[in-house]
Amino acid sequence: RCHMEQGLLGMAFDEDFNTSRTLLISYIEEGSCDGPNDSDLILASIKIGESGLLDPSTISPLRAIEQPYRNHNGGHLIGIGDNQYLWGIGDGGSANDPINNGQNNSNSLGSISLFSYLNGEIFPVLNNTENDPYVLHHGLRNPWRFSLDDNNMIWIGDVGQNCWEEINLVPLFERKNLGWSIKEGFQDVEEGGVCDENIVQ
């Protein structure tokens, strides 16, 4: 790989893994080393072969997220039960979110997305006909790691730009706008990247 944040970014087991021998994976598709390499973020299924290793010939893409730039890909993937999964997706890259994806609910960039996986296909879980039906939480820059605790609270690690590295704690199904790119942490986003003097809270 010749660019940052490339390759395999996330993996989760199919809930019926013992029978299906299937995993869900999240990765950046291979792109050229020349130019921006704005390759798509891919969600796919893959099977374990008879050798006990992943069989590349069984990869089946399920969803592709167009990445306008080469960084902020997110990609973390966890199962939460009932055949449902959370998928972290970055804002598409570059600085200051130039396309305003973090505050745009019509696409999945800058979000924690929620989907179900059944019979080899994915489906949205949310009843959302006005915006992207997969978006659960938005306003994120690059949620590359997160975890669900025993109280159904999501701990979301979001990579900051100039001043704040965020850990957001939110209820699983209580949809939240986490601020980016209007806010970075507790302060307004400014083009100059000027940070408040007291930035640890």
Residue ranges with predicted function:
Residues 6-8, 84-201:
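Beta-propeller domain segments
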Residues 1-96, 145-148, 152-160:
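Acidic, Gly/Ser/Thr-rich repeat motifs that build Ca2+-stabilized beta-propeller blades
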